[in-house]
UniProtKB/Swiss-Prot annotation:
Cofactor binding note of this UniProt entry: Binds 1 FAD per subunit.
MF (Gene Ontology): flavin adenine dinucleotide binding; N-methyl-L-amino-acid oxidase activity; sarcosine oxidase activity
Family affiliation: Belongs to the MSOX/MTOX family. MTOX subfamily.
Modified residue annotations for S-8alpha-FAD cysteine: 308
Organism of this sequence: Escherichia coli O1:K1 / APEC
Cofactor(s) listed: FAD
UniProt function note: Catalyzes the oxidative demethylation of N-methyl-L-tryptophan.
Name listed for the protein in its UniProt record: N-methyl-L-tryptophan oxidase
Domain of life: Bacteria
PANTHER family, per database record: FAD DEPENDENT OXIDOREDUCTASE DOMAIN-CONTAINING PROTEIN, PEROXISOMAL SARCOSINE OXIDASE
């Protein structure tokens, strides 16, 4: 059997692509080395932020606004346990922060609902937060967080119900191209399709070693908290920049545990074996202490944590492009630790590619040619 589309990697983007392409009427095969959702990539840990006024650059705003529409649509499939929680996101940092300047610029350009607060205003609204006098906060009322594993599970189930073929716990070991399409090699045999999407995450270089993607081991952890830090108490999700430039992110507490991680830093790795579990690197348990001690002093001890991986591009912007020399294969990689919020729209972009539809978005900034 020859498929219209084979998806290599069915985590964040791949699960979305499988659903949207199958819903469009294509004959699709989703593949993954494990059984998604799983603990081997970048999507586990239950929650991910979604921010609209984007500090990483204005080029992302049209994408994230479409992503939000798709997240709202997906959430309607799980109304008892919503995939998107509109908690709001407070972005904290020094008044001269370049990241916050980008957030403010994005908000102005796209007329987004963002409120600027000075240090006293931040601490008056959320007494649990402490910041220096030179800090500001940019509060995104309409943003919040996503339940990442639930989203992937939902997409995979919806795709299956729509007739999508799924080959999980079966790594793809090679990709071949010919005039007739794409062939993948797996332990279960060979499969053919007219087109392929490669969204294999951290270990995409096992298949395509020439790609400029660097795996980095990262950790996040849950710390003892109480009801003051919960969504019910209107405590928001957050990003925070310390005076030394270190960047953190976190979520409202659930079940008396507040999740936080450090965005920058981490350990460069070259194999899955090097992504050791949480606490096997000495700094894991204390990585968030500088932020917690200064900004959230009421948070208690570390309860537990987890390790994940970022697939970093050289400039930490996404790679969305066809494989050089093979216009029938789309790469979506290098998401660099800020990609999950875009998974829905990237999956839709992948489905459009499979249907020979022109994308509604300017993807020029994400081309591989920028590294030449």
């Amino acid at each position: 059997m020859k498929y219209d589309l084979i998806i290599i990697g069915s985590g964040s983007v791949g699960a979305a692509a499988g659903y949207y392409a199958t819903r469009a009427g294509l004959n699709v095969l989703m593949t993954d080395a494990h059984m998604p959702p799983h603990q081997h990539g970048s999507h586990h840990g239950d929650t991910r932020l979604i921010r609209h006024a984007y500090g990483e650059g204005e080029k992302y705003v049209p994408l994230v606004l479409r992503a939000q529409m798709l997240w709202d649509e997906l959430s309607r499939h799980n109304e008892d346990d919503p995939i998107f929680v509109r908690s709001g996101v407070i972005n904290l940092g020094p008044a001269d922060s370049a990241f916050l300047a980008n957030v403010a610029h994005s908000a102005e350009q796209w007329q987004l609902n963002v409120e600027k607060l000075d240090a006293q205003g931040i601490m008056a609204r959320w007494p649990e937060i402490r910041v220096p006098d030179n800090y500001i906060g940019l509060f995104e009322t309409d943003s919040g967080f996503l339940r990442s594993e639930l989203a992937i599970k939902t997409w995979i189930q919806l795709a299956k119900e729509a007739g999508c073929a799924q080959l999980f716990n079966c790594p793809v070991t090679a990709i071949r191209h010919d005039d007739d399409g794409v062939t993948i090699e797996t332990a279960d045999g060979e499969y053919q399709a007219k087109k392929a999407i490669v969204c294999a995450g951290t270990w995409v270089k096992d298949l395509l070693p020439e790609l400029p993607v660097q795996p980095v081991r990262k950790v996040f952890a849950w710390y003892q908290a109480d009801g003051r830090y919960s969504v019910k108490n209107k405590f928001p999700a957050f990003t925070g920049e310390l005076p030394n430039g270190d960047q953190y992110y976190g979520f409202p507490a659930e079940n008396d545990a507040l999740k936080i991680g450090k965005h920058n830093g981490g350990q460069v790795i070259h194999s899955a074996d090097e992504r050791v579990p949480f606490a096997e690197v000495v700094s894991d348990g204390s990585e968030a202490f500088p932020f917690l001690r200064n900004v959230l002093p009421g948070i208690g001890c570390c309860l537990y944590g987890a390790a994940c991986t970022y697939d970093n591009s050289p400039d930490e912007d996404f790679i969305i492009d066809t494989l050089p020399g093979h216009d029938n294969t789309l790469l979506i990689t290098g998401l660099s630790g800020h990609g999950f919020k875009f998974a829905s729209v990237l999956g839709e972009i992948a489905a459009d590619f499979a249907q020979d539809k022109k994308s509604d978005f300017d993807l020029t900034p994400f081309r591989l040619s920028r590294f030449q």
